[in-house]
């Protein structure tokens, strides 16, 4: 209002930017890095706001720091060198991503990933108790059994025959199979166990028909 009593008003819209968008995608497909996957660089990626295109996302893993740039579509990614991954101990690792936007707002998000580079130890018990399958035993079902890491898939190969089993929560596997197709002679049961991370362990057991 001026001295003559005239009044005027003005307005302006102010946008308050107090939030930052930042996510981390699933790592190595299933958030489990196997031994085979650790032999190559591991990609860590995610998304941010398209408004933050060109800004830097700082990623930390196991004490190492890496930088990624937000792309025009809001995505970002960085490759962690295989040597850095292999330097970590098996177990749960925390990946942290941090970003500060143009308004000065900062955000940091964590993502858990499991490093499992240890091949499962697999065993197979004596076949037909004494590793000799008699004619009478061959006429029925023969139990193949053993142990491996819990929840592993097990493939048993004997000559041209292939059988499948799965370990239970205690790591025990068992399957009843027919060996009637095998002629008399010496054979080897080859066993491959693959754990949830994709690591494989092998063993074998000779037996006689």
Q: Where are the predicted features?
A:
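Flexible, low-complexity linkers/stalks enriched in Thr/Pro that connect modular domains
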Residues: 2-25, 105-125, 203-209
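Short, solvent-exposed loop/edge segments of extracellular or virion-exposed proteins
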Residues: 17-37, 120-137
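Aromatic/hydrophobic beta-strand junction motif of beta-rich domains
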Residues: 44-48, 142-148
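Short strand-edge motifs at loop-to-beta-strand transitions and within beta-strands
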Residues: 74-78, 171-177
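Surface-exposed, short loops/turns at beta-strand junctions within beta-sandwich domains
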Residues: 82-92, 178-186
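Hydrophobic/tyrosine-rich beta-strand signature of extracellular beta-sandwich/beta-rich modules
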Residues: 93-97, 191
């Amino acid at each position: 209002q001026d001295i003559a009593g005239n009044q005027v008003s003005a307005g302006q819209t102010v946008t308050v930017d107090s939030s930052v968008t930042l996510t981390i995608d699933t790592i190595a497909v299933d958030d489990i890095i196997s031994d085979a996957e650790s032999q190559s660089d591991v990609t860590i990626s995610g998304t941010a706001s398209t408004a933050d295109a060109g800004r830097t996302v700082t990623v930390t893993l196991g004490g190492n720091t890496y930088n990624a740039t937000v792309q025009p579509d809001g995505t970002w990614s960085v490759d962690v060198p295989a040597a850095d991954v292999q330097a970590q101990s098996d177990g749960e690792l925390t990946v942290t991503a941090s970003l500060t936007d143009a308004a000065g707002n900062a955000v940091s998000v964590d993502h858990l990933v499991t490093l499992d580079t240890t091949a499962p130890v697999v065993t197979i018990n004596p076949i037909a108790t004494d590793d000799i399958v008699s004619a009478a035993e061959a006429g029925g079902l023969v139990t193949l059994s053993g142990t491996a890491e819990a929840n592993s898939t097990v493939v048993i190969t004997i000559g041209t025959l292939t059988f499948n089993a799965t370990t239970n929560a205690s790591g025990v596997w068992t399957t009843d199979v027919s060996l009637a197709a095998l002629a008399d002679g010496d054979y080897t049961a080859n066993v491959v166990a693959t754990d949830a991370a994709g690591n494989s362990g092998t063993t074998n057991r000779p037996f006689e028909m």
